[in-house]
């Protein structure tokens, strides 16, 4: 059960919080992070196992607990926003294999806005927050285009 939870947590991080993935890899802290996090839910998992709770249910409950502090994902939010508002650029990044890299760069460019606006789950549906981010993303993409790193799709 412990290894399954580690694998599922790592998979979640890779897809939803790649900034954390890179940070942990840079510090060689992946194993320690996963170990510490999974240990925090093992007592609950063992209790549910002893109560004959199906493994799939245990995994789902534990993974929800393990990912609570990782939500909402700025990366996922910005990826969706990039697709909605700048679809051609999103497709270009995806085709060139730079989508994750560029979304992480956009996260960096927008980090102050995320902090000052206290990004929460409710921010996902807040049009004001979205409208605050769009000019910053546009500015980033314009700088990228001026540097020659971004080609407009035609």
Task: Label every PLM stretch briefly.
Residues 1-154:
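C-terminal alpha-helical interaction appendages
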